[in-house]
């Protein structure tokens, strides 16, 4: 009896395993190999195809690069085959575990049913000894199958965990490599941008250093003596102010000196006096208190002549052109030179106004009629000298 039961269970198990295996083979497209019906042509084709089925059968008449490529190709193919066989084995184990679990569940249900029938059946007390023995054998065998199915399920779970961990680790490593490459690329781009910025800032720094050096040279070449003379020439309303501030070399080397033409230059051209080769003409747009309409009567235009020993400004006041060029090297004209605010600022820093109509208060002025107009001379020029010196000192402190 026991032998028959053992054989029966073995046959059932083999049939179930065979069905599961055949089902998986059909699922993955694995067909049994048949050698019948093969001719010589197909055999030769198979032999030709199987010449390079693995990296061990690579022909020696190919180059090293091709051999290396074939080795890598076959290695990748072998890895793919191993993965496929591993997946098939895992699937087969899972199917076997599922079959075992189903069998265990059926056995447990049968045991429960038999126990219930034995307790409540009419023949519960009159069962034979062989029947009870068969029930015990079935219970033991079903318990064994259930334990085996449980072990198979645990193994499947462990295999799945290993495979998933391997895949997750590979994905994490690939992500880290891509992030490192991205960080390196960003670092390279930042370094290139910083180098470009430093290269663009270098010329500006050099020009600033050149500008400061020229200012230092200009400040070192200044003189403190200021001479104010009263013009006693034949032309009326003419004043000459001589301020030896710069040397000729400093004035000519000044890169910020510009020659600006007066707005009235087309109508009244400026005069150019060149007693020395290094003198140059310079006309500007800076007004002073002496060039206002209240002080200036009607007179021709004005000009400034720059000499090697200083700066000589000859001002001819005129009602139409309220301009005065005082080029001492301490300032240069820019794009804000011809605005109202800049003119007011220069007027506030210039010498105090001297009104010709106040005879009692301006005791230092003397009127004389000669030539073709009224000529005013001042015996004492201390006020004008102090104003010019203060203006130059303020310009120097500003620079």
UniProtKB/Swiss-Prot annotation:
Residues 81-91, 99-110 are annotated as: Calmodulin-binding. It holds the Pfam family IQ. CDD domains: IQCD. It comes from the Eukaryota. The keyword Membrane applies. Coiled coil: none annotated. A motif (Nuclear localization signal) lies at residues 1-8. Residues 130-158, 159-181 form the IQ domain. GO terms for molecular function: calmodulin binding. Keywords: Calmodulin-binding, Cell membrane, Membrane, Nucleus, Repeat. It is found in: Nucleus; Cell membrane. One of its GO terms (cellular component) is nucleus. Residues 285-294 have a biased composition (Polar residues). Residues 198-219, 262-302, 346-377 are annotated as: Disordered. Its main location: nucleus. May be involved in cooperative interactions with calmodulins or calmodulin-like proteins. Recruits calmodulin proteins to microtubules, thus being a potential scaffold in cellular signaling and trafficking. May associate with nucleic acids and regulate gene expression at the transcriptional or post-transcriptional level. Belongs to the IQD family. Binds to multiple calmodulin (CaM) in the presence of Ca(2+) and CaM-like proteins. This is Protein IQ-DOMAIN 25. The lineage of its organism: Eukaryota, Viridiplantae, Streptophyta, Embryophyta, Tracheophyta. The gene is IQD25.
């Amino acid at each position: 009896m026991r032998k028959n039961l053992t054989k029966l269970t073995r046959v059932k198990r083999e049939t179930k395993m065979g069905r599961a295996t055949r089902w998986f083979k059909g699922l993955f497209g694995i067909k049994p190999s048949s050698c019948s019906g093969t001719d010589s042509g197909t055999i030769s084709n198979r032999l030709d195809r199987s010449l390079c089925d693995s990296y061990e059968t690579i022909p020696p008449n190919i180059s090293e690069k091709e051999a290396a490529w074939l080795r890598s190709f076959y290695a990748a193919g072998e890895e793919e085959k191993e993965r496929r066989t591993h997946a098939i084995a895992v699937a087969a184990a899972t199917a076997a575990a599922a079959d075992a679990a189903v069998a265990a569940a059926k056995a447990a249900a049968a045991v429960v049913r038999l126990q219930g029938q034995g307790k409540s059946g009419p023949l519960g007390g009159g069962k034979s000894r062989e029947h009870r023995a068969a029930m015990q054998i079935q219970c033991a065998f079903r318990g064994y199958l259930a334990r085996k199915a449980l072990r198979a399920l645990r193994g499947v779970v462990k295999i799945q965990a290993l495979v998933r961990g391997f895949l997750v680790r590979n994905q994490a490593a690939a992500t880290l490599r891509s992030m490192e490459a991205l960080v390196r690329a960003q670092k390279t781009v930042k370094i290139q941008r910083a180098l470009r910025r430093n290269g663009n800032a270098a010329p500006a720094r050099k020009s600033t250093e050149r500008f400061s050096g020229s200012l230092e040279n200009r400040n070192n070449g200044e003189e403190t003596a200021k001479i104010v003379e009263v013009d006693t020439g034949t032309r009326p309303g003419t004043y000459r102010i001589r301020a030896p501030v710069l040397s000729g070399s400093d004035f000519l080397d000044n890169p910020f000196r510009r020659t600006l033409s007066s707005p009235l230059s087309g109508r009244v051209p400026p005069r150019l006096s060149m007693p020395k080769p290094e003198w140059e003409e310079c006309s500007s747009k800076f007004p002073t208190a002496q060039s206002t309409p209240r002080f200036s009567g009607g007179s021709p235009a004005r000009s400034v002549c720059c000499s090697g020993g200083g700066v000589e400004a000859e001002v001819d006041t005129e009602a139409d052109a309220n301009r005065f060029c005082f080029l001492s090297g301490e300032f240069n004209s820019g794009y804000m030179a011809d605005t109202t605010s800049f003119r007011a600022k220069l007027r506030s820093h210039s010498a105090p106004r001297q009104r010709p109509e106040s005879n009692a208060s301006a005791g230092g002025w003397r009127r004389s009629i000669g030539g073709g107009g009224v000529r005013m001379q001042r015996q004492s020029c201390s006020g004008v000298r102090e104003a010019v010196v203060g203006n130059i000192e303020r310009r120097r402190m500003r620079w």
